[in-house]
UniProtKB/Swiss-Prot annotation:
Function description: An accessory protein needed during the final step in the assembly of 30S ribosomal subunit, possibly for assembly of the head region. Essential for efficient processing of 16S rRNA. May be needed both before and after RbfA during the maturation of 16S rRNA. It has affinity for free ribosomal 30S subunits but not for 70S ribosomes.
GO MF annotation list: ribosome binding
Residues of the PRC barrel domain: 94-167
PANTHER family linked: RIBOSOME MATURATION FACTOR RIMM
Keyword annotations: Chaperone, Cytoplasm, Ribosome biogenesis, rRNA processing
UniProt organism field: Halothermothrix orenii (strain H 168 / OCM 544 / DSM 9562)
Name of the protein: Ribosome maturation factor RimM
Signal peptide: none
């Protein structure tokens, strides 16, 4: 079940004294929380389905009131739980954009056909994201800039890059 879910947030603590939880969004689209009716709270192989009563935003956090959680103690019991949703409930992205989880495991090649490795992580920086590629003998940090990433082929699970001079020497 867990592999068919994506993580969109993490409960960091309670909010107030009426059972609300404070959630750090782990998505580029925090507004997606407004569409939630139910979520799965997951930690240490424990999965709990919860209905959402109310959502509001406070600074960089999402404040969520779940059905049946009505006091601080009950809210604190969910600290450090991840909020997950089924993959089929993800938002539609513009063409040419991908969720991080979709790119993990893709093979990365240069435009000359040299295999570099597989995508193991994508680091969001607030600017240009960095694609972390694990090779057989070496790891690479590739900026996800249009000038460098020339093709992403989801059908073949392949990314083609045109490395700038020195990029692969680091």
């Amino acid at each position: 079940m867990n592999d068919k879910m994506i993580t969109i947030g993490k409960v960091t603590t309670h909010q107030g004294n009426k059972g609300e939880v404070r959630v750090l969004p782990l998505t580029d689209y925090p507004e997606r929380f407004e569409l939630l009716e139910q979520v799965f709270l997951v930690r240490d192989n424990r999965v709990i389905e919860k209905r959402v009563e109310q959502i509001r935003f406070h600074k960089k956090f999402v404040i969520i009131k779940f059905e049946g959680i009505d006091d601080i103690g009950a809210a604190l019991a969910y600290k450090d739980y991840f909020i997950k949703i089924p993959r089929e409930e993800t938002l539609d992205l513009p063409e040419g954009h991908y969720f991080i989880f979709e790119l993990l495991g893709f093979e990365v090649y240069t435009d000359e056909g040299i295999f570099l490795g597989k995508v193991v992580d994508i680091i969001t920086t607030g600017g240009t994201d960095i694609i972390k590629v694990k090779g057989d003998k070496k790891d690479y940090m590739v900026p996800a800039a249009r000038e460098i990433v020339v093709n992403i082929n989801p059908d073949e699970e392949k990314i083609i890059i045109k490395p700038i001079p020195g990029l692969l020497d680091l």
